[in-house]
Amino acid sequence: MISTDSLARIALDLQLGISHQDRFHRLIQSVRSLLHSDASALLRYEGGQFIPLAIDGLMQDVLGRRFALADHPRMEAIARAGDVVRFPADSNLPDPYDGLIPDHDDFRVHACVGLPLFSDQTLIGALTIDGMNPTQFDGISDEELRLVGALAAAALSNALLLERLARQSSEPLAPSTQNGPGRAEMIGRSPAMDRLRHEINVVASSELNVLILGETGVGKELIAKAVHQGSPRASAPLVYLNCAALPESVAESELFGHVKGAFTGAIHNRAGKFELADKGTLFLDEIGELSLSLQAKLLRVLQYGDLQRIGDDTPLKVNVRILAATNRDLKQAVVEGQFRSDLYHRLSVFPIHAPALRERPDDIPLLAGYFCERCRVSLGLERLRIEPRALQLLGSYDWPGNVRELEHAIHRAAVLARAEQGSQAPALECHHFNLAAAGAPSSSRIPVEQVAQQMTAGMGLRTATDAFQLQLIEQTLAAQHGNWAATARALEMDGGNLHRLARRLGLKP
C-alpha cells in the first residue's frame, strides 16, 4: 500500500532537483525505495526505441544501451499496452535487464512492472520496476502504480518541453532530424561531450565551414553528421569522401568529375563529389592527405563557388558547405609547407575538437553498453553482458584507438565469449579483451602471434581471419598514430586496398 504522503514527498522532492537529470535520479531512487524494488529505470521513447535516462540498481552500462522495440518484445509490450503491465515470473518474453542487476548477474529478473508514460496521449517514455522475488509487487495495486507513473510522466514531459523550447529559441533543427534511428547519436554524459554538443549546436544552423580535429577513432564522421542534420541543409545530401583513400590519378575526377573522353577509360560523363553535394554538405575526411596541387583546386571552389569537370572548359556553379576532418596538426603542416595556409584558414572558420576517449573515461561504461547491445543484435544473442571486473578493465585502459577501438574490442570479446561459453547469453570477462595493463603504452599490447592463437579457438576460418586482420590493422594504425598512409606502408599494402579492407571489417565507414 502506497500512502498519499509518500507520493506527495516524491512530488516535492522532484521540485528540489537542480537539473532534469538530477530530478530523474531523484525520481527513480524514490520509486525504488517506495516500492522496495531491486532496480528501476526511467526511459525516453524516441525513434522506435527506449533510451535510458536514469537508472538505479542496474549496471552502469545500461545507460548506454538502446532498447529497440523490434528487438525487445517486453519493451514492445510496454509501449503498446497503454496501461500498467505486469509480467508473470514465467513470462516467455525475455527481460532486457536479465544479468544487469549487480550481485544478481547469474539470475533472471522475476518480478517486472512496466509503466508506459504519456503526454497528450503520445508515448514519451516508460518507467520499469524490477525485483528478484516473483511476488515482490503483488501488494501494490494498479491504481497506485498509475499514480507513480503520472509523476514520472509529468517530470519527463516537462523536461522534453523545455528541451524543445530551448532548441526552437536557438538552433532549430530540420523537422526530419528531430528523432529517428537515422539521426546521429553521440553517446556520453561527460563534460567533454557536453562541450562538444554545445559547439555543434552553435555552428550547425550557420553556413560556416567546419574543421573537425581529433585522433583516429574519436567519431569525426558522427560529428559531421550531427552538424549536417542540425543545419538548414539537412534535407539535402551529405556526401562523404575519404581523401586518404584517393590515388592521385583519380582524385581530381572524384572531386570535380569528368566528361566522356577526357582521359583513357572515361567512357561517360561523371559528376564529382562537389556536384553530388550541391545545395548540401560535403564531408572531406582526412583532408590533410590531399596533395598540394589538389589543395589549390579545392581552394578555388571554396573561393568562387565554381568548378570545371576534367575535359570541360565550362564552369559549373555549386553551392556546397564544407565539413573537413583530420587527425593531423594542420598548423604544423602549414609551417612545414605540406598544407596551404590560405586553404587552412578557409576550412578552419569554426574548428571543433573531438575529445579522445581517455579525456572522457566516465563515458566508457555507457559506450560499452551501447556496443554490447549492438553486438547482441548482430550476433543474434539472447543476452550479452559485461562482468563488473571487465568493465573496470575497460575503464582503466588508455584506448589509443579511441571509441572505434572500444567498439571492436567488445565485438571481438563477444565472439570469443560465445565460442568459449557456447551460450546464447555470454558474459564478457577480462580475458576476452586483448588489452595492455592499465596505463601501459599501446606498444605493450599482446603480440599478434598470441592474439591469433586466442582468436582462432572455436572459430571458423573466415571469422578467425577477419578477427586477426582487424587486430593487426588496429595495432599498426595505433603504432602509426592514426596515419592510414603510414599504416599501409607498414603493412606493405596498397592504400586503396587497405581502406577497402578496413571498410569491410567495420574499421571505417
Curated annotation (Swiss-Prot):
- What SMART domains does UniProt report for this protein, alphabetically? AAA, GAF
DNA-binding region positions on the chain: 484-503
Q: Which SUPFAM superfamilies match?
A: GAF domain-like, Homeodomain-like, P-loop containing nucleoside triphosphate hydrolases
What organism, scientifically named, is this protein from? Aeromonas salmonicida (strain A449)
* Descriptive protein name: Anaerobic nitric oxide reductase transcription regulator NorR
List S-S links within the chain.
Answer: none
Give the GO biological process terms. phosphorelay signal transduction system
Where does this protein act, in terms of pathway? Nitrogen metabolism; nitric oxide reduction
Residues given in the record as ATP binding sites: 214-221, 277-286
Instruction: Name positions with the PTM 4-aspartylphosphate.
Output: D56
Any one Pfam family match given in the protein's UniProt record, by short name: Sigma54_activat
Q: Which GO terms describe its molecular function?
A: ATP binding; ATP hydrolysis activity; DNA binding; DNA-binding transcription factor activity
- What domain of life? Bacteria
Q: Where is the Sigma-54 factor interaction domain?
A: 186-415
Q: What does this protein do?
A: Required for the expression of anaerobic nitric oxide (NO) reductase, acts as a transcriptional activator for at least the norVW operon. Activation also requires sigma-54.
Which keywords belong to this entry?
ATP-binding, DNA-binding, Nucleotide-binding, Phosphoprotein, Transcription, Transcription regulation
